[in-house]
């Protein structure tokens, strides 16, 4: 499993914080950030890498998380969530089988961002009664 991470200019500093944290937790990271990328481009780049392997997960950081989230939801087969708290990050894996989260660097601080990332990458899909919803999401787009 790889954690694919990317950020636009507004999210660069926080991306480095999250990246360093996850690397210290021994996760394999792929950073697709390129200088001057808009949140649209970076979200598409993260999604492309995430979709290469079923186990891959993605994290995109921009100013507010909303722009990247809107892009991610336009990608066929991508289930994404905009999160700004640890519980939502964890639960979106468990209940929605989300493969990507977006965060806003102007909304969350360093420690919260690390905890959000940790909750997301450590979350496991629960299946069962949640599969009906996931099937509905996967039929869309």
UniProtKB/Swiss-Prot annotation:
Record's protein name: Galactose-6-phosphate isomerase subunit LacA
Phylogenetic placement of the source organism: Bacteria, Bacillati, Bacillota, Bacilli, Lactobacillales
Gene3D superfamilies: Sugar-phosphate isomerase, RpiB/LacA/LacB (3.40.1400.10)
Keywords for this protein: Isomerase, Lactose metabolism
Key word Isomerase present: yes
Pathway(s) the chain acts in: Carbohydrate metabolism; D-galactose 6-phosphate degradation; D-tagatose 6-phosphate from D-galactose 6-phosphate: step 1/1
Reactions listed under catalytic activity: aldehydo-D-galactose 6-phosphate = keto-D-tagatose 6-phosphate
Name of the gene this protein is made from: lacA
Keyword Isomerase in record: yes
Coiled coil (UniProt feature): none
Source organism per UniProt: Streptococcus pneumoniae (strain ATCC 700669 / Spain 23F-1)
Pfam families: LacAB_rpiB
């Amino acid at each position: 499993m790889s954690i694919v991470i990317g950020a636009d200019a507004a999210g660069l500093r926080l991306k480095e914080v999250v990246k360093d944290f996850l690397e210290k937790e021994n996760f394999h990271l792929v950073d697709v950030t390129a200088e001057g990328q808009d949140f649209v481009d970076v979200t598409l780049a993260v999604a492309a890498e995430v979709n290469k392997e079923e186990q891959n997960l993605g994290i995109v950081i921009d100013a507010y998380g909303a722009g990247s989230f809107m892009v991610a939801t336009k990608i066929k087969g991508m289930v994404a969530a905009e999160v700004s708290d640890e519980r939502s990050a964890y639960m979106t894996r468990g209940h929605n089988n989300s493969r990507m989260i977006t965060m806003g660097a102007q909304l969350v601080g360093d420690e919260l961002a690390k905890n959000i990332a940790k909750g997301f990458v450590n979350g496991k899909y629960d299946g069962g009664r949640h599969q009906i919803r996931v099937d509905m999401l996967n039929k869309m787009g």
